[in-house]
Design a protein with these regions (language model features):
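C-terminal output helix
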Residues: 89, 107-119
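Receiver (REC) domain active-site loop signature in two-component systems and cognate sites
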Residues: 58
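Alpha4 helix (beta4-alpha4-beta5 surface) of REC/receiver domains from two-component response regulators
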Residues: 65, 86-102, 114
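Acidic catalytic/metal-coordinating carboxylates
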Residues: 35-36, 62-65
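Two-component/phosphorelay signaling modules centered on CheY-like receiver
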Residues: 14-32, 97, 119
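Active-site beta3 strand of CheY-like receiver
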Residues: 47-53
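Short amphipathic alpha-helix used as the core "switch/output" element in two-component signaling
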Residues: 42, 64-75
Length: 123
């Protein structure tokens, strides 16, 4: 039995999903990845206790749209947002949500580990 709760990777880019999933497993986290926000919402993972590693810009439902939908459904999912395209409008929209943290792509393993530790241990 794995002592770490799962991390759910939601990103429309397959290479990102694959590499993050491998990295997270190497760090001891069970993972499940999703190619879209809609796929995550339609899965059983949405009701599991875990952390969401979420890309902001995706076709269809964006990462911000997913955060808003989870909030509307009153699902308190810990979320680490990642993006390669930071814009002030998105940052301002995100300020109203209790996120674990924000990663700007490309990010380091240490940056990811720091946010996972913050989620797990409150550090």
């Amino acid at each position: 039995m794995n002592p770490n709760p799962p991390v759910f990777v939601v990103d429309d880019e397959e290479p990102v999903r694959v590499s993050l999933s491998k990295l997270l497993r190497a760090m001891g986290y069970p993972t499940q990845s999703f190619a879209s926000a809609t796929a995550f919402l339609e899965s059983e993972a949405v009701s599991e206790h875990g952390c969401l590693l979420l890309d902001l810009r995706m076709p269809g439902m964006s990462g911000i749209d997913l955060i808003e939908e989870l909030t509307r459904r009153q699902l308190a999912v810990p979320i680490i947002v990642m993006t390669g395209h930071t814009d002030m409008k998105s940052v301002q929209r995100l300020e109203s949500f209790p996120l674990v943290g924000f990663l700007e792509k490309p990010f380091s393993v240490d940056q990811l580990r720091e946010l996972l530790d913050r989620w797990r241990f409150g550090t």
